[in-house]
Amino acid sequence: LQTARLLSTLRPTELVTYRERSDDHPYLDDVLQAEPSPGRSLWIVSWGFDVPRSLARLQGRPVVYQAHSSGYGFGLPPGVPVVAVSRNTLGYWGDRAPRNPLFWVPNALEPQWLERGARPSLSDRDAVTERPIDVLVQKRKSSPYVLEQLVPALQAKGLRVEVQSGWVDDLVDLFNRSKIYLYDSAEYWRGRGVSEGFGLPPLEALACGCVLFSSFNHALADTLTPGVTAHQIGQGTLDNDLVRISAAVASPSQWLPAPSTIEELLADSSEAQWCERWNEILAQLNDLVRHGAMSQMSDMVLRSP
């Protein structure tokens, strides 16, 4: 939905459903019947599990795969460009489809995180004077280690730990009121057999001035540097985690990245930067169409080995 919303600021954009009909959006079968191939539209598919079927239905039309998670196991036909949301995913397709056109546009943070996040600024101003939550954990994607071992041990040490599992009206406010944010998704994604496609929550935490303890699996390694922007969770022993997290609660400023480091990281994740990158890619895709490089059936298109 974010992709459709932001692309609509660059080109006329329509969201199309393909599993169920909707009163709010066109249905794929109807659109394909009304517009003979190849048509004038550029199609973008993104839901990994359905990509092979979607590409088959769109054969003969210009189509782009916006790739989030990797590891689904399918291959791509020649002539289908990939726009990866992480360098981790870019490398995956650079290996599996080296002759397909490859691009990289990381996901964007919503403006509310950049505008309202209470991180220390370059002028040493902190918009938050009170952070009553010592440690924030979001239950979804969290590992059994975090939920069953680390959280109880932190609570036993007297720390106030918030485990968020339901709907929250204002996530920015929740993060702004937290000193530490824990994110450990490696086990979650391993159990699903695919990679962490991007990982926005750690960036959201940094935008709100939280000290970040995180895993570094898959796309998280794109943006997080151990000991600089984030600290490894599950580092060796439970006791080691307890000592480090307790120290960060006692003195968060000693564990935060430099304000300039955070701002540089967040600037690269803004919607403005996203739109600029996509605008450049759309121009390149137009060139590819003119050169016949986006035809899945053309004999001229290079095949990946």
For the regions a protein language model found, what residue spans apply to each?
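Conserved catalytic-core segment of nucleotide-activated headgroup transferases in glycan assembly
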Residues: D95, W104, A108-L174
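N-terminal pre-catalytic "stem/leader" segment of glycosyltransferase-like enzymes
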Residues: L1-F49, S215-L220, P226-Q235, D241-V243, ...
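Acidic donor-binding loop of glycosyltransferase active sites
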Residues: N176-R192, C210
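Conserved donor-binding/catalytic loop of nucleotide-activated donor transferases
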Residues: N176-R177, P201-C210, S215-F216, P226, ...
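Conserved donor-nucleotide binding/catalytic region of nucleotide-linked donor-dependent transferases
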Residues: I245-L265, L285-A293
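Nucleotide-sugar-dependent
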Residues: S185-G199, N217, A221-D222
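Hydrophobic beta-strand scaffold residues
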Residues: V63, V161, L182, L212-F213
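Extended catalytic core of nucleotide-activated donor transferases of GT-like folds
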Residues: T17-A97
